[in-house]
């Protein structure tokens, strides 16, 4: 799987740096993103993704952000998603539903927001809630979330925890960001779980994003791993840099209007972290 991830990332980066306009990759990503909007009605951000991870089957998800109400220099929105994931060799279906508000400051160049979510495991009775905060501009993103278990199943215990994510635009590559994502989960029957993800997000085409990262876990029984994520988004971007723009002459973007980010997705861990009762195992950290 590690070899597959590396090959996949190199392949996509190589293709994306070519002249993608009119290429098979660009046309295919536009078609897939166009199809996703038909699955969820309404205007806003829609995303379909494939998550490739060492030692696990691929996870597939669909996510949408929709505006509920416009407010002065901001909005109130909802975000919901549905996806499959594998835990202890068992396939699970997880759903998330959240409400959030965002507001623009400093001539619309700074975005701040708060959100609250409920996560539900449709395969078990596991439920979790979270609250989150975000602060963003054209170059830097900061997200932080606190998670609290609401209900356990017979043989699984939902863990409480928190995380933060700090991302920065890569100098001269306006279509790429690097990020660090630290998380901690409070063990009940076993030790706490801590870890840090380090990786990169890339906007390859108007409709195709790619993320690759290394998940460094500080917990016996949970192996460190690479993961790669392919994301098809809709609607296609009307402006902004993509990989075909290559290297810019300017290190960082100018202060841009963040109004276009009011309906971007909330960055959080949508998967429910659990501990298995009566055994010495825990689920993967994401």
Regions found by a protein language model. Name each.
Residues 34-36, 58-71, 93-107, 129-146, ...:
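Feature captures outer-membrane beta-barrel proteins of Gram-negative bacteria and organelles
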């Amino acid at each position: 799987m590690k070899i597959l991830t590396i090959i996949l990332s190199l392949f996509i980066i190589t293709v994306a740096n070519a002249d993608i306009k009119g290429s098979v990759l660009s046309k295919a990503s536009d078609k897939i993103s166009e199809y996703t909007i038909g699955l969820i009605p309404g205007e806003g951000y829609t995303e379909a993704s494939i998550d490739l991870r060492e030692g696990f089957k691929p996870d597939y998800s669909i996510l949408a952000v929709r505006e509920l109400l416009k407010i002065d220099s901001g909005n109130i929105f909802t975000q919901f998603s549905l996806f499959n994931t594998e835990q202890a060799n068992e396939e699970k279906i997880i759903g998330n539903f959240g409400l959030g508000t965002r507001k623009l400051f400093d001539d619309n160049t700074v975005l701040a927001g708060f959100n609250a979510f409920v996560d539900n495991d449709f395969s078990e009775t596991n439920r979790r809630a979270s609250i989150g905060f975000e602060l963003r501009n054209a170059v830097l993103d900061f997200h932080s979330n606190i998670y609290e278990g609401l209900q356990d199943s017979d043989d699984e215990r939902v863990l409480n925890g928190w995380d933060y994510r700090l991302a920065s635009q890569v100098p001269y590559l306006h279509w790429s960001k690097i990020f660090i994502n630290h998380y901690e989960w409070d063990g009940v029957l076993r030790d706490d779980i801590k870890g840090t993800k380090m990786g990169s997000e890339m906007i390859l085409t108007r409709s195709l994003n790619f993320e690759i990262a290394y998940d460094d876990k500080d917990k016996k029984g949970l192996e460190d791993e690479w993961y790669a994520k392919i994301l098809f988004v809709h609607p296609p971007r009307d402006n902004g840099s993509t990989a075909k723009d290559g290297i810019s002459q300017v290190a960082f973007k100018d202060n841009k209007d963040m109004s276009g980010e009011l309906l971007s997705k909330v960055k959080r861990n949508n998967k429910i972290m659990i501990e298995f009762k009566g055994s010495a195992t825990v689920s993967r950290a994401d």
